């Protein structure tokens, strides 16, 4: 693996650990030339999925785009990064199980909302307010009331 610091092409693996139920491998490496250490992650490359947006536009599925939206919803909330990684892994596993080359963005949004609801109520409402495009405060209040009602 090429060193990100000095660009030397070879490095030694110092430590290897499985993460996310063995779906990801974390490796600590040491550059043979400069001696600096760095971390790499390995994950099985999934089959490409095309996301069909509400306006009919198609774009390739991007894990980072999903993570960005979830991180934004969880901003300054006590949600561990591991929970967000697990959420993304679960959604990707569910998408792969569908075995469909194209999935509507609404399906992914529903998957995110279902999982966020169990992780953090505030993050759920934040995500829902953008995803559902609440037109006014009344619609937002309905969502909060629904959440409170289900929590009882």
Curated annotation (Swiss-Prot):
Cofactor(s) annotated in UniProt: Zn(2+)
Keyword set includes Hydrolase: no
Highest taxon, organism lineage: Bacteria
Bilayer-spanning residue ranges: none
UniProt keyword annotation of Transcription present: yes
Cofactor note: Binds 1 zinc ion.
GO biological process assignments: negative regulation of DNA-templated transcription
ZnF bounds (unnamed): 3-34
Domain (ATP-cone): residue spans on this chain: 49-139
Keywords: ATP-binding, DNA-binding, Metal-binding, Nucleotide-binding, Repressor, Transcription, Transcription regulation, Zinc, Zinc-finger
GO molecular function: ATP binding; DNA binding; zinc ion binding
Function, in words: Negatively regulates transcription of bacterial ribonucleotide reductase nrd genes and operons by binding to NrdR-boxes.
Family per similarity comment: Belongs to the NrdR family.
Protein name: Transcriptional repressor NrdR
């Amino acid at each position: 693996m090429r060193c990100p610091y000095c660009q030397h092409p070879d490095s030694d693996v110092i430590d290897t650990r499985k993460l996310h139920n063995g779906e990801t491998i974390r490796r600590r490496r040491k550059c043979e030339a400069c001696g600096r250490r760095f971390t790499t992650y390995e994950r099985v490359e999934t089959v490409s999925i095309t996301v069909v947006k509400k306006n009919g536009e198609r774009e390739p599925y991007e894990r980072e785009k999903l993570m960005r939206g979830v991180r934004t919803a969880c901003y300054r909330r006590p949600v561990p990064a591991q929970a967000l990684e697990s959420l993304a892994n679960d959604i990707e596993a569910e998408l792969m199980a569908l075995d469909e080359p194209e999935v509507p963005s609404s399906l992914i949004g529903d998957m995110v909302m279902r999982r966020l609801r169990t992780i953090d109520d505030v993050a759920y409402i934040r995500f829902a307010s953008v995803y559902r495009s609440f037109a006014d405060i009344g619609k937002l209040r309905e969502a909060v009331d629904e959440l409170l009602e289900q929590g009882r």
